[in-house]
Amino acid sequence: MQSLQHKTALITGGGRGIGRATALALAKEGVNIGLIGRTSANVEKVAEEVKALGVKAAFAAADVKDADQVNQAVAQVKEQLGDIDILINNAGISKFGGFLDLSADEWENIIQVNLMGVYHVTRAVLPEMIERKAGDIINISSTAGQRGAAVTSAYSASKFAVLGLTESLMQEVRKHNIRVSALTPSTVASDMSIELNLTDGNPEKVMQPEDLAEYMVAQLKLDPRIFIKTAGLWSTNP
C-alpha cells in the first residue's frame, strides 16, 4: 500500500454527492483537493470543508462540456495546488425517457457532459502525468454503461462510451505508469438519484456516496505496480 499524503487530486462534479464525499475522504488521507463544478457556491463550500481537515483546497466553476472553461479551471486549480496526481472524472447528468421522447438536444447534452466532459478534463491533465510518468485517473461510469434499459438509451450510450474511452486510454498510457480505471456503481443515494426518484423512496438502503469514496481511497492506495481496471459496486439489498 502507498500513502496518499501530499498528493493532489482534481475532482469534477465536486460540489455535492459523490464528488463531495470523495473530496472529504481523500482530504482525510492528507490529499490536497481541487474541485470543479458548475455552481461556484457549492464547490466553494466543499473547499472550506476540505480545508477544515488540514489540507489545501482550490476550486473553480466550469461546465465540463466546454473545453475553454475546463482549461481555465484546471489552470486556476494548478496555480494554487501544483500538478495533479489524481483525477476523478465524476461530473455527470442523466435524463430518462423513450428513444423517441428525448429530443436531439437532450441527447447531445448528455453525451457532451458525460463523455466529452471526461475527454476535456483528461486532456487538460494528462500531458503532465505523462511527463512525470505517474498518475491516477478514475472515471465514474455506471451499471447503465454495462446494460441498457428501455428508458436509458441516451444515458447508457454515454456511460458505455466512458467505459470504451477508459479501456482504450488505459492501454495507451499504462506504459507511462499511469493507472486508468472505471467504476460502474449501481444506484448511489446522490442528490441526482434522489431528485430523479431512483432510490425507490429508500435512499438509506442503497449505496451512499461515502461508500464509493471509501472504495476509491482504497484503490488509490494500492502499490503503483498494480491497479484495478474496472470495478462494479452494488447495493446489497436496496
From Swiss-Prot:
Annotated EC: 1.-.-.-
Keyword presence, Oxidoreductase: yes
Active-site residues, as the UniProt record annotates them: 155
Keyword Oxidoreductase annotated: yes
Enzyme class name: oxidoreductase
Binding residues for substrate: 142
Annotated binding of NADP(+), by residue: 10-34
Keyword annotations: Oxidoreductase
Matching SUPFAM superfamilies: NAD(P)-binding Rossmann-fold domains (SSF51735)
GO molecular function, one term: oxidoreductase activity, acting on the CH-OH group of donors, NAD or NADP as acceptor
Pfam families referenced in this protein's UniProt entry, alphabetically: adh_short
Family the entry assigns: Belongs to the short-chain dehydrogenases/reductases (SDR) family.
Protein name per its UniProtKB record: Uncharacterized oxidoreductase YoxD
